[in-house]
């Protein structure tokens, strides 16, 4: 009996869950290389939910490598699976997401029921539909700097890797039926655990009528197949298929992969924990006579409070994430306890960045930390950041968003230095990396249209005019700013100046925003003004430039 997937990674003596998983793997004294596996059907645009499995495996692999083990991290593209439904959205290899109207959706519909690797790539750039979406997932791993070996199920079948285990399952068909009946309704006495591919129409069918293991063949009729709430029509062809011309059903294919690849550990979502894992464990032990790998359940993510769903379009890709986050911040997100459901909130992404920055400072012992937090930083940080360097600078994310209001690189650096976020002795590489966060924060502000989504009109003053009272009040405020007050004092003085000149406060704020942004709204004015070059602000409020 394998370990409880809900308990693996829960070791109380370890601050980092990946170390607890590594303990469980080592306890089995596995052969080397230790194999860590994940997998997914390349059914459509891969998102951060699919990436969960890669990252959980990555951290366990790194924990084992730290202990001197040789580790192979593989990820199977379950690309011999049939296309069950036409997706709502697709993406090209540059991550441009398109609707079905921009590709030949009819071709996809005509290929329902066929393996992903037998369906033409809608964009015409890869060998197949399956190859296209596997390539996107592989690119995701490369973007984050995670080295994963991708394995095609279709190729494993074609190369005969599945043949021996498929034969064994069919030899033990009675035993396979008894096991499956524990987890699935309506397992008929004539059920055969093999899905041939029709030689006529190319669809994966279920209508096996006879098995000849001496010849290594099955006879079949291409029947209709239920796929969710729809039926995929069979063509009625009667034929013969070899054990390479088809596939095992999922509940048998998954444990077969464990045997073929020699898998020692596999993480999976809670949907599998309550369905596929118990049956897979049973099949492994009682049909294949192998030991299942060490399992671990991870919780799903939500996106801005809603379930990730490709069908509903509520997804975010790794490429989109890296438009607003450094790769190391995204990797840090997966350091967190996998057993807790977490929300990936784009709107509040600044909080995740701030949390990462504190995590980094704990590693360099720049801030106090609890014993567990200090141990977690010590263990995980070198896995998150490829090149730990104490001189690295992190500009606070929301401040970086403020800097993003101007496109002037020199001004960005000037303001950051003025506010103390870039030390005088900072090396050039550290300054360059620190300011690179500005572009991401600027993209975040634009994406969420938040309070930082404004453009400072520095080059020339917007075309604005004010009545005499407002003009006089702006001159008074300019004099106050020239005295060198901080943001809080300036914010307070804005109210006082409006009051002295009998001006509506909202209109006075609008006057300031119009001068700076050519807009009637903006960030907290006093705080923002204090971050800018004082001479520029004074001259702008005096309408001199």
From Swiss-Prot:
Write out the GO biological process terms: lysyl-tRNA aminoacylation
Q: Where in the cell is it found?
A: Cytoplasm
- Intervals of motif 'HIGH' region: 42-50
Q: Which reaction does it catalyse?
A: tRNA(Lys) + L-lysine + ATP = L-lysyl-tRNA(Lys) + AMP + diphosphate
Return the motif ranges for 'KMSKS' region: 307-311
Pfam families attached to this UniProt entry: tRNA-synt_1f
Which keywords are on file for this protein? Aminoacyl-tRNA synthetase, ATP-binding, Cytoplasm, Ligase, Nucleotide-binding, Protein biosynthesis
Q: What EC designation does it have?
A: 6.1.1.6
| GO MF term set | ATP binding; lysine-tRNA ligase activity; tRNA binding
Q: Which InterPro entries match?
A: aa-tRNA-synth_I_codon-bd_sub2 (IPR020751), aa-tRNA-synth_I_CS (IPR001412), aa_tRNA-synth_I_cd-bd_sf (IPR008925), Lys-tRNA-ligase (IPR002904), Lys-tRNA-ligase_SC_fold (IPR042078), Rossmann-like_a/b/a_fold (IPR014729)
UniProt key word Nucleotide-binding: yes
An example Gene Ontology CC term for this record? cytoplasm
Superkingdom, taxonomy of origin = Archaea
Q: Note the NCBIfam families from the entry.
A: lysS_arch
PANTHER family per UniProt? LYSINE--TRNA LIGASE
Q: Which family does it belong to?
A: Belongs to the class-I aminoacyl-tRNA synthetase family.
UniProt protein name: Lysine--tRNA ligase
Recorded source organism is Haloarcula marismortui (strain ATCC 43049 / DSM 3752 / JCM 8966 / VKM B-1809)
Its organism's taxonomic lineage begins at:
Archaea, Methanobacteriati, Methanobacteriota, Stenosarchaea group, Halobacteria
Gene field: lysS
